From Swiss-Prot:
The gene is rpmD. It holds the Pfam family Ribosomal_L30. This is Large ribosomal subunit protein uL30. The keyword DNA-binding does not apply. It comes from Actinobacillus pleuropneumoniae serotype 5b (strain L20). One of its GO terms (cellular component) is cytosolic large ribosomal subunit. One of its GO terms (molecular function) is structural constituent of ribosome. Belongs to the universal ribosomal protein uL30 family. The keyword Methyltransferase does not apply. One of its GO terms (biological process) is translation. Keywords: Ribonucleoprotein, Ribosomal protein.
Amino acid sequence: MAKTIKVTQTRSSIARLPKHKATLKGLGLRHIRHTVELIDTPAVRGMINQVSYMVKVEE
Protein backbone atom coordinates (compact mmCIF):
# COMPACT_ATOMS: atom_id res chain seq x y z
CA MET A 1 0.00 0.00 0.00
CA ALA A 2 1.25 3.48 -0.87
CA LYS A 3 2.37 5.76 1.94
CA THR A 4 -0.15 8.51 2.70
CA ILE A 5 0.02 11.86 4.44
CA LYS A 6 -2.68 13.96 6.09
CA VAL A 7 -2.81 17.60 5.08
CA THR A 8 -4.88 20.14 7.04
CA GLN A 9 -5.56 23.73 5.99
CA THR A 10 -4.72 26.02 8.92
CA ARG A 11 -5.04 29.49 7.37
CA SER A 12 -7.55 31.19 5.10
CA SER A 13 -7.08 31.43 1.34
CA ILE A 14 -8.64 34.92 1.25
CA ALA A 15 -6.25 37.59 -0.11
CA ARG A 16 -3.72 35.00 -1.31
CA LEU A 17 -2.08 34.67 -4.69
CA PRO A 18 -4.37 33.02 -7.27
CA LYS A 19 -1.63 30.44 -7.83
CA HIS A 20 -1.74 29.46 -4.15
CA LYS A 21 -5.55 29.28 -4.15
CA ALA A 22 -5.34 26.94 -7.14
CA THR A 23 -2.77 24.80 -5.31
CA LEU A 24 -5.11 24.41 -2.32
CA LYS A 25 -7.90 23.41 -4.70
CA GLY A 26 -5.56 20.90 -6.35
CA LEU A 27 -4.81 19.39 -2.94
CA GLY A 28 -8.56 19.09 -2.30
CA LEU A 29 -8.65 21.59 0.56
CA ARG A 30 -11.77 23.76 0.76
CA HIS A 31 -11.75 25.61 4.08
CA ILE A 32 -9.88 26.07 7.37
CA ARG A 33 -9.51 22.85 9.41
CA HIS A 34 -10.38 20.72 6.36
CA THR A 35 -8.21 17.59 6.30
CA VAL A 36 -7.49 15.33 3.33
CA GLU A 37 -5.42 12.16 3.07
CA LEU A 38 -3.14 12.11 0.02
CA ILE A 39 -0.65 9.67 -1.46
CA ASP A 40 2.90 10.81 -0.71
CA THR A 41 4.36 11.65 -4.14
CA PRO A 42 6.91 14.25 -5.25
CA ALA A 43 4.13 16.22 -7.00
CA VAL A 44 2.04 16.41 -3.83
CA ARG A 45 5.10 17.34 -1.77
CA GLY A 46 5.86 20.18 -4.19
CA MET A 47 2.30 21.49 -3.87
CA ILE A 48 2.55 21.32 -0.07
CA ASN A 49 5.88 23.21 -0.13
CA GLN A 50 4.28 25.96 -2.21
CA VAL A 51 1.55 26.61 0.41
CA SER A 52 3.43 25.44 3.51
CA TYR A 53 2.48 28.62 5.40
CA MET A 54 -1.23 27.66 5.12
CA VAL A 55 -1.17 23.90 5.82
CA LYS A 56 -0.09 21.39 8.45
CA VAL A 57 1.24 17.97 7.42
CA GLU A 58 1.05 14.74 9.43
CA GLU A 59 3.08 11.75 8.24
